[in-house]
């Protein structure tokens, strides 16, 4: 049996909110089987829990935000969720003392480190995968995203930026997902932004925590970060990282091929909602044997069985 996973123990980190610029403390804690991922605002009295479900994503401008019926939000969840998806964590309670997840270094890598530091515990219940049975597609102008049947989880992603630095880089990546491929090739890709946009955002009290410490910053011609890029194709890889996080609000690891052109948070969420609304397009499956699983979430050394 392939089992569900949670973290072995609580782990804590402090960072800065991308938009507020304020200090944020994040705690990741174990959760029972079939809990899913639940986020909790501990700065509210009483604390407010918001389950990570596609229908709770009600804000997709500049980030992905979960918002409950009372309008209480937790923003910038996508990099943390990419790490949860990449390591195959099914169940966790995540507490945060602010309206946004800390931006850390602008990638998923610090969250991968946190989860690995907490340890990964296998639980006594079968892991469920969301298997795509037929194609589902959403479009917005020339942008589009699609999920279709595939034995593992493949990502086929293309961006199209006219900026000379991005245009010079590879803007099309096809990869077959595994935890090791995610950690090595995707997790360190940072969010990127243009100096002209950052100036506008700050004038509107946004991106107050943004800096070259947590983003790739470009002017009209080049990357301004003194250390340059982490990957030659960091731009498209960060868009893939965002998509991993955005798709994980489906509630399960996906078995299928995700193909996208110029998509962002809004279209990614539309795709998940469209998929879940068409119940003949997917099914939940479990696996008895490791050899039968078409996606590898390699269990790190030291994982224990509950």
Curated annotation (Swiss-Prot):
A GO MF term: UDP-3-O-acyl-N-acetylglucosamine deacetylase activity
Residues bound to Zn(2+): 79, 238, 242
Q: Cite the annotated pathway.
A: Glycolipid biosynthesis; lipid IV(A) biosynthesis; lipid IV(A) from (3R)-3-hydroxytetradecanoyl-[acyl-carrier-protein] and UDP-N-acetyl-alpha-D-glucosamine: step 2/6
List the GO terms this entry assigns under cellular component, sorted alphabetically: membrane
The record's listing under Gene3D superfamilies reads:
lpxc deacetylase, domain 1, lpxc deacetylase, domain 2
Q: Which reaction does it catalyse?
A: a UDP-3-O-[(3R)-3-hydroxyacyl]-N-acetyl-alpha-D-glucosamine + H2O = a UDP-3-O-[(3R)-3-hydroxyacyl]-alpha-D-glucosamine + acetate
Q: Which SUPFAM superfamilies match?
A: Ribosomal protein S5 domain 2-like (SSF54211)
Residues annotated as signal peptide = none
**Keyword RNA-binding found:** no
Cofactor(s) needed by this chain = Zn(2+)
Q: What is its EC number?
A: 3.5.1.108
PANTHER family assigned: UDP-3-O-ACYL-N-ACETYLGLUCOSAMINE DEACETYLASE 1, MITOCHONDRIAL-RELATED (PTHR33694:SF1)
This chain's function reads: Catalyzes the hydrolysis of UDP-3-O-myristoyl-N-acetylglucosamine to form UDP-3-O-myristoylglucosamine and acetate, the committed step in lipid A biosynthesis.
Protein's name in the database: UDP-3-O-acyl-N-acetylglucosamine deacetylase
